[in-house]
Amino acid sequence: MSYVMDETEEGINIDNTQHDLELDRDSSTQQPAQTHEDDGDLLGLDKPIKLKTRAKIAKVDNQRIFNHNGIPLLVKTHSKLLRTLKKNDKNFYSEPRSSISKSQKFEHEYENLSSVLQFYQLWCHGLFPKATFKDCIHLIRALGARSPQLRLYRRELIAAELHKLKVAKGIIADENQDAPSIPEEENTTDPSNEEWNSMHMSALVPGSSNKNGLFVDSNSNEDFETTNEVNAAASLADKDALSTDDKAEQTNAITSDTHNNDVDSDDPFSDDDDINIDAHTENLHPASGTQHQDRPKETTEENEDLELELMREYGA
């Protein structure tokens, strides 16, 4: 009772506290009933599954930058920007004034820059509506650094504009054949590159139908057959010349040996035999560095037959 009296003195309502206690009891009795109901579907297999579609992440790529809202739109509409700049310059310099101050020049440049920025802001908004102007510029710069297609497109545009300026100033003559054309949206491949790639692949792929697969022009074999025949004839002529030289040296050595043997056959203690042996070795191995070895006829004929078979396999 003393506790209740203290609460009443402090201004606490006893009726509200009793009501709160009753609510707590009711909630405690209702919680076990709910748990018994949920015991049958603990894993949630009977609950309906809500499918959510993932939103596509917008990004700046070659497909977006080369569509009708990308760089082709800039190429078509940049003439309007040039006209506005010329109009601003004409209005600025047409006003009658004695002198132009620096502040007036800065204001005029500010107007031109604001028109340029507005032009590119509208273009970026049409290209990438969800991105800010700063983010769009950053994404386009990153794409230009890693996309070779975009770099090639930009170089061709610059070359076309330089050609127009040179023609306008009279530096070069206006020839439609020499004028660089503005690149199209679709990628056009060079036929020479396709031929080179096909020839390169035919050379690298083993087991191809072409016999001369290691050569560049693997389909035409007539030129290689003629060259192989010429090379074979030249090699045979060289071998015949070498064989005749070897035979002449052998005959010279044999005649010198027989002559020395006939002269000094009676002297068993003569030293001419060693001299003849040295002369024979010198004839076989001259000092010029070219070694002519005594090759038997059988080995040379076998080597020639093998070389002819190899030339027929690779050259036929």
From Swiss-Prot:
User: Which residue intervals are annotated with compositional bias (Basic and acidic residues) in the record?
Assistant: 17-27, 237-249
A Gene Ontology cellular component where this protein is annotated is:
replication fork protection complex
Q: Which UniProt keywords apply?
A: Cell cycle, DNA damage, DNA repair, DNA replication inhibitor, Meiosis, Nucleus
Q: Does the keyword DNA damage apply?
A: yes
Outline the segment boundaries, as ranges, of region: Disordered: 1-42, 176-195, 236-316
Q: Which GO terms describe its molecular function?
A: DNA binding
Note whether Nucleus occurs among the keywords: yes
Which GO terms are recorded in the biological process aspect for this UniProt protein? Answer: DNA damage response; DNA repair; DNA replication checkpoint signaling; meiotic cell cycle; replication fork arrest; replication fork processing
Where, subcellularly, is it found? Answer: Nucleus
A Pfam family reported for this protein in Swiss-Prot or TrEMBL:
Swi3
Please list the residue ranges that the record marks as compositionally biased, kind Acidic residues.
1-12, 263-276
Q: What InterPro entries does its record include?
A: Csm3 (IPR012923), TIPIN/Csm3/Swi3 (IPR040038)
The record's family statement is: Belongs to the CSM3 family.
Described function: Forms a fork protection complex (FPC) with TOF1 and which is required for chromosome segregation during meiosis and DNA damage repair. FPC coordinates leading and lagging strand synthesis and moves with the replication fork. FPC stabilizes replication forks in a configuration that is recognized by replication checkpoint sensors.
Q: Which PANTHER family match?
A: TIMELESS INTERACTING-RELATED (PTHR13220), TIMELESS-INTERACTING PROTEIN (PTHR13220:SF11)
Subunit details: Component of the fork protection complex (FPC) consisting of TOF1 and CSM3.
Instruction: Indicate what this protein is called per its UniProt record.
Output: Chromosome segregation in meiosis protein 3
Q: Which organism is it from?
A: Candida albicans (strain SC5314 / ATCC MYA-2876) (Yeast)
- High-level lineage: Eukaryota, Fungi, Dikarya, Ascomycota, Saccharomycotina
Q: Which gene encodes it?
A: CSM3
